[in-house]
Amino acid sequence: MNFRELDTSNGVKAAESSFRTKVVLAREIPWNGFASSNSITSEQYNLISKYDKHTDAEKKEKFAANSASYVNFFVNFINSTSNIEIIQYLLTLINEIIEIDPRAAGAFSKITKDDDKSYPYSVFFRLLNREDAYTNLHASIALAQIMCAGKPTQNDVESFFNWILKLLRKNNSSEVEVGLIALQSLLLKDDFRIFFNNIDGSALLLNILQALSTSSVNIQLLYETIYAIWLLTYNKDIAAAYSGTGLVANLVQLVKTVAKEKIVRLSLSTLRNLLNNGKSNEEMIDNGFVRMLNILNIKKWGDDDIPADIEVLINGLAKDIDNMSSFNKYKTEIISGELEWTPVHKSERFWKENISKFEENNYQVIKHLHQILKTSQSTPLQLSIACHDLCEFVRHHSRGKAIMTITNQTRYHGYDVKSNEEVKNQALFALQKMMLNNWEYLNAK
């Protein structure tokens, strides 16, 4: 899936939808003319004239008092007309009343037709095939909300999810976005989360997220993708299944690199859902998320949900760190970059008991220590500790110097002239220890 050069000639972006909705609702539909031509009955005319162009509060009151009549009028008129402007208008009214009063979706789900077992879903399914992006989007939103409130057949559910999957596999960003928005409404219901996961939808969303993470960022599409994943992770089994897939690493990277607050908020909320599921905690720690959380915790945020999520994540991961072995705590410190002169660095016992563990994951910890020495942004404290610990590894591991040469070239000589006295001392001390180590080796020969 390539999001680098997406065709956006068709479809409708969510960011544009609000503007389009206002344009559609500004239309003057000639209800009086329909009544005069007997296209609608006088009762239907009275019904719609008391509703259309009124305030939200008035619409809510009118709909609640006569919901069955309004539902039948909206759906049957859409089903009987070919006028795209009227179809768009009525779809917008349907989604509007469901937004004003979510209970309205239940009223739409109860409408039936003797010769159509799929009614009213069949009406909206036909609109999904229209060559009109606005109609596709608003028909899919209405259909998803009505399905969540009703009891659709298995065939209807499969048909709708298959339509969504086709959109999610497109290279057209706007079509993908329509699929995501329709999906989000469905994922409010746990049965639909499970269904979507069973048809490999969870993996498909992760693929989209990974593709977006490696291209020039389409913020709105990124937001819609994370939003869908966030809804999925309210199911504990799905949250646990995401462990080990790379989702945690992707979300942590987005928190680190994307400045948009809405992306940070949604990424943190998703990570909060993943907390304590599978090996997600370990993945967060291994990806240096603890350090990132501490940085985020001192920032001021416009959204109150962000500090709340940060607090939950910090406290949740702190419990895991407390339960870690001394080596795992040490590894977490090195990988996160939050280096301090904790007792383990200078503990002879620690180095003797844990030296073989430095071989794990292809010398992951050693490579991180090397990276600290190479990075110009490393602080004097980080450089000092990295020099010290690499030296201790060479001193305690039987093949330490050879491994250091294989994994990376040591760079102590580049740092012993640094202006910082602590770094200079640690680099010189490291060289002395390494030379002593070689001398002891030669004497043993």
Swiss-Prot record:
GO cellular component, one term: vacuolar proton-transporting V-type ATPase, V1 domain
Cross-referenced InterPro entries: ARM-like, ARM-type_fold, Armadillo, ATPase_V1-cplx_hsu, ATPase_V1-cplx_hsu_C, ATPase_V1-cplx_hsu_C_sf
Single GO molecular function: proton-transporting ATPase activity, rotational mechanism
Pfam families xrefs: V-ATPase_H_C (PF11698), V-ATPase_H_N (PF03224)
Cystine crosslinks: none
Stated role: Subunit of the peripheral V1 complex of vacuolar ATPase. Subunit H activates the ATPase activity of the enzyme and couples ATPase activity to proton flow. Vacuolar ATPase is responsible for acidifying a variety of intracellular compartments in eukaryotic cells, thus providing most of the energy required for transport processes in the vacuolar system.
PANTHER family associated with the record: V-TYPE PROTON ATPASE SUBUNIT H
Family: Belongs to the V-ATPase H subunit family.
Name the record gives this protein: V-type proton ATPase subunit H
The organism of origin for this protein: Dictyostelium discoideum (Social amoeba)
Encoding gene (name): vatH
